């Protein structure tokens, strides 16, 4: 049989030989490596190579990081001084998770319960009235004999100067001490829309000055009340007195420094207004008169109706209210062109400013001025200069047109006088052609058209015509008309002759002396001839000098034979109207009677 122990020994021998062989190989490698190192060291000693020069390192002097920052970036707040090490790009820390609905509902109920308990406690601890007056039997003397008393001091509670004190400082301290005191501006800051809740304290006192008392008023139900305007010489607040409070304090005078105990807050009907009022209706002593104010005054200006303004003001600032000061400034600004447009809203009355800025979301009082730059304000100055130049040119053009109108009037008067002189010089002639040749162009400007002539009056008195000069116009009418029309169409033909009385009339227009007339003459009146004669001038040319050729005379003057030729030598009663045109191209003058 094969022995296992012998086989194991053989394996160990083989393993030992293998390990011995590996050891010999390693030692041989070490020997060769050491020989190579020695050979390399010998070669290095033989060959000498110069080493390259070392690189010079430039040393920079760097200032502190704070000095390298731009000052503008620091001033503007752009550079926060943080570097990359200070900024992390990872997710930020997670905040607390929102509470679930049931927890938030429970907290809301707890807060409401605490608030209701607080209100109950406040109502329980709230005073109904100021403390009662001292018992006279305890002190043995009465202080009412000393008050009201003149003084010149500042009340420590209202912080107002008083000149007359109605109660002593000790009494005021007993009644007001221990309560929360609010001035007008503090209460306006505390009570806010839309809830308008009173201060959540046990007892509070509102101090103010009675600026005005509205007097007795009546509600719709017939109940009486009054309204007191309280002020601290800067802000104002209204307080209404109803019921027993009205019966007790309706006679309070203006200028009295008062203290109100726990007044109710009266909400406005329109919450957007942002103004609330106070209300007193208690039957207890809730109003305390401290003294009379020193600096409260009233405006001395007068309204349009003539009554005094009577608006309250601080006498230290002046005797005129802000509204009338602004009006006076606006009047002075309106006379100066540099303030006419650009600063229109600089001095606007407060009530108008509040009305203009009041709207959706506006609550409270206006507490500042608004300045706005008018667009193109600089360009408007150049436009104003052009407007002045245009106005100057327009006035010069009107002046020229008026001078031209006066010249036309003088020409018309001279032509009328020449007409009268020509008529008087032709009184001895019996030929119509001679009479018409003596007439000037101005006489024909008078638009003599027979029955269509309108008489001109000399100083308001019409020229009288003799009834003896009237001749029946029906005799020989067709032949005369034919001859006159032929003479008009043919200037070389002779005109028929007419009497001088028919041409000139009863009175001479130039001299005013009566002219004898031939009553036996059977010649036709030239008025009948002119009725059917064609017009020499066009209506446009006649209107240019002030006469309307389409005007018809009264029916009572159509049968007159010499009315159309009778003219007055004076044109004083003729009214002219000058009509000017705005256009530079059309500077024609038109005279309309």
UniProtKB/Swiss-Prot annotation:
Biased composition (Basic residues): 121-130
Residue segments, region Disordered: 29-52, 82-130, 452-476, 541-567
Compartments, as annotated in UniProt: Nucleus
Impact when changing residue 587 to A: Lethal; lowers primase activity 3-fold
Role, per record: Required for DNA synthesis. Required for entry into or completion of S phase. Involved in DNA replication and seems to participate in the activation of the pre-replication complex (pre-RC) and in transcription elongation. May play a role as key coordinator in assembling the replication fork. Proposed to function at replication origins following the binding of the mcm2-7 complex prior to the recruitment of sna41. Probably is required to stimulate phosphorylation of the mcm2-7 complex by the dfp1-hsk1 kinase complex.
Domain notes: The zinc finger-like domain binds a zinc ion and is involved in self-association.
Protein name: DNA replication licensing factor mcm10
Gene that encodes the chain: mcm10
